[in-house]
Amino acid sequence: MTKYIFVTGGVVSSLGKGITAASLGRLLKNRGLNVTIQKFDPYINVDPGTMSPYQHGEVFVTDDGAETDLDLGHYERFIDINLNKYSNVTTGKIYSSVLQKERRGEYLGGTVQVIPHITNEIKERVYRSGRETNADVVITEIGGTVGDIESLPFLEAIRQIKSDIGRDNVMYIHCTLIPYLKAAGEMKTKPTQHSVKELRSLGIQPNIIVVRTEMPVSQDMKDKLALFCDIDTKAVIEARDADTLYAVPLSLQEQNMDQIVCDHLKLDNPAADMTEWTALVNKVRNLSKKTKIALVGKYVELQDAYISVVEALRHAGYSFDTDVEVKWVNAEHVTAENVKELVGDTDGILVPGGFGDRGVEGKIVAIQYARENKVPFLGICLGMQLASIEFARNVLGLEGANSSEINPDTPYAIIDLLPEQKDVEDLGGTLRLGLYPCKLAEETNAYNAYNEPVVYERHRHRYEFNNQFRPDMEKEGFVFSGTSPDGRLVEIIELKDHPWFVAAQFHPELVSRPNRPQPLFHDFVRASITNKESK
């Protein structure tokens, strides 16, 4: 029978529930269990696709085209699985589904209420995740903090699941904070006690408490928490700040967290073999070289907006025993006069995806600098579109060349709406989303990176390269190294007379893994290291 683990949070948000859930997933997978994982977000948006990155951070896209929470990126990177649209559920999705059923008359004329209709829908999403993946274990993270009004239906639903399928098949893990008061020189357990009290008042008794802390938690403090929270002392797990995220699974294993989980759920599996993971962490902690990459974006104040990009750069660096330092460059501040000052000390330049016109001209200036000064360059989504526009303006001499997204009246729409997008009115969920094939041209940097004729990558865009400009740009050394199999859509571009200048319409960062870097990032970082060594 499928087992269910629920991860909740208390005291404050951003405690690392997602990392805790992902780390536990890795440990259970390495015990030979088939693990799937999902995130429940209590906001009323249907998905984060139309939310500002400042509100929510990065939008992570799954193979099947779901726009999801950035925690799914952690899940995929840690557990090394590909998730799907059932892996991220919001209040908006739940209510939308219930209202559609009500309109179809599925409730037989009854009054539709939070209990049982909303809670039943939430439970069905939990069970469906297990059914769709044939999982041995389903880990579900509940977003937000215990005490939030928005979370109440989700907490009630997961409370009911224990009654529905039995206590041996359900486990509750609560993540909290033990703050350190510098003035008093003390760590305080009271916030955790109150958070657990709140959770218990809702009918949920946590089986494990994971305490986030800056300082070591003494045995006396663990005993105190165990007493007041009514759990075993061994089930108080310390989650101290780590030097690398990838060390967290090893820390949890040292404290026998996965064994406690297996004992409670009556799973008789051998201990997790973390040899390969330990080697990865040792490598990460002992990188001997450095390279610096400029990330030129418009959301640089909130680095979570580019979290998968940064992780993909790091993964690529691990292959070369190199620590990749990201220099954050605000695209709005970049001008032709100061671009050398802002990016001249870096070994490579990356322009990530985005929407809208803010910061676009600064990104184009940075791309021009990379092209003219032979600096390794990687463009992603909007970065690929702007690389095309920069080339059209400054090599072909097409003054005013632009994207019709940025300037609908441009005389040269190098980037234009996909034909199927022309009549689309809704913004949410209507982009070209998910996994699509890309055919690679031989004897190109793109082909050399993948070493395969056809690859599959995840997309999230509405605009595409305008094919009427292809012949003129090709004559000037602009290479279309990746296209859709029918040749209609441009997927990857690069430059002939440049050490390494590649840009992709898709989002390669979404499939990178710490032990298996994404090929374009791998070769981009290698080119950046070569550039540094040649200076």
From Swiss-Prot:
Query: What is the protein name stated in its UniProt record?
Result: CTP synthase
Supply the InterPro entries for this chain.
Answer: Class_I_gatase-like, CTP_synthase, CTP_synthase_N, GATASE, GATase1_CTP_Synthase, P-loop_NTPase
**Entries under SUPFAM superfamilies matching the protein:** Class I glutamine amidotransferase-like, P-loop containing nucleoside triphosphate hydrolases
Q: Which Pfam families match?
A: CTP_synth_N, GATase
List the source organism.
Bacillus cereus (strain ATCC 14579 / DSM 31 / CCUG 7414 / JCM 2152 / NBRC 15305 / NCIMB 9373 / NCTC 2599 / NRRL B-3711)
Q: Name one GO cellular component term.
A: cytosol
Query: For this UniProt entry, which segments traverse the membrane?
Result: none
Domain Glutamine amidotransferase type-1, which positions?
292-534
Q: Which UniProt keywords apply?
A: ATP-binding, Glutamine amidotransferase, Ligase, Magnesium, Metal-binding, Nucleotide-binding, Pyrimidine biosynthesis
Which residue positions are annotated as catalytic?
A: 381, 507, 509
Positions binding UTP in this chain are 13, 188-193, 224
